[in-house]
Amino acid sequence: MPIQIIIDPLPGADRVAVLNDGRLIAYFEDDGTAAAPRPGSIARARVERVFAENKMIACRLDVAGGSIAASLRWPGGAMPKPGDRLAVTVAAEAREGKPIQLRRGVVREDPAMIFESRGRGLRLSRRLAATGFEAPAALVDLALKLKGEMSITLRLGAAKLDADTLLARAVGLSEEVKAHAESAAASTSGDGVISTGPDAASTAQHIFPAAEVIMDTAGSRWQETDLDSMIEAAISPRCQLAGGAVLHINTPPGAAVIDGDSGNSNLSPSALAGAMVVPVAEAMLLRRISGPVVIDFPRLDRTAMQRIDAAMRDAVADDPLHPVCHGFTPGGLYTLTRPWRWRPLAELLAPTPQRLGLAALRLARRAGMGAKTGIVVVPPAAGNWLNGDGAAYRDEVMKGLASRIEFLSDEGCVQTRFDAQVMKG
């Protein structure tokens, strides 16, 4: 069965689930009310403070209703001064009390390459160079033409593409970077977003380009596969493995810790370690685990450690954030670092009034397709959102229904992240 991308559309609030052989491996969603720009957005930032000793810059970005803090690590060269305006790309969402992260210039990337609007020519990533890969002559020629304008970094994914496909992607990305860089240079709209980053559906299709895309307008596929239960399970600290073994996943601020437990299985330490590898890689993508990660595999001999290290590197090779595997410590713990980009899944799914209100709208949409009238019962917090900040969402969904659906606030209504109560008339 091919990888499937299931899109549950709602104006400004699409949900996107990615399934591999029936397993949920990634989840994304849009938030049309978010003030902060999405990763991949191009913006102009205003320099506030410069920390030359650690090459960090504190910036401000103009957004609807004010401005937000942002952080930029300076890649080298003469540092800017407070008050300077810079073209930047949003690299990561805010997390753990830290502001959103920026990258200097316009940056566009795919699994095979990174283009930046700074001239450094063509280079291979360390992992790609280790394979003995040689860049096609046509791509080298393109890099020479662009030298001084932008740089190209080829990634491990480049080795999977033929020369013509690689060149076509490079030309497309170079044109995109050039257009965004020109827009940023010409912008007179202040220190804000010039171009928004990819939405949830585009992000999923970018990461899984060969996946089958299913537009689930009625929500039937979402219900049939019980995706809400899968998503709920994805924020549990326990992940069940085949044969009764268990992964314990803890993600406190600072570093994530993943521990394997044989549970009710009869797996040997070596077999348990092998059974952990792919689920660990999938859990990091699905749960959006980033930063330092410590994995407590069962005690292994040196040969088994080498085998598990190679398996981990293979398992994360296609991760869009390209984790760096450090290997086993002398104490037997396995460590890696996964770059930041998105908020952790548990934080994304926190049951806020907005999330509860959106769940009620999805239920109203499903109920409205099979009944002349209906009442969706929601807790007061969700009702207040639907009648306030969420009124535009509510009106957009309701005008697409042939039936009449009303929302009733009830103190006794118990609502999860995903469900409300419905009574059909």
Segment roles from a protein language model:
Residues 1-36, 41, 48, 63, ...:
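Extended, charged alpha/beta regions that create polyanion-binding interfaces
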Residues 35, 78-81, 287:
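SF2 DExD/H RNA helicase N-terminal ATP-binding lobe
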Residues 41-43, 68, 84, 332, ...:
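A generic structural signal for short beta-strands and their flanking turns/coil linkers
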Residues 43-44, 49, 55-58:
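Structural signature of multi-pass, alpha-helical inner-membrane proteins
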Residues 55-59, 94-104, 108-116, 243-424:
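Conserved glycine-centered short motifs in functionally critical loops
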Residues 59-71:
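OB-fold (S1/OB) nucleic-acid-binding surfaces
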Residues 69-82, 297:
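Alpha-helical multi-pass transmembrane bundles of energy-transducing inner-membrane proteins
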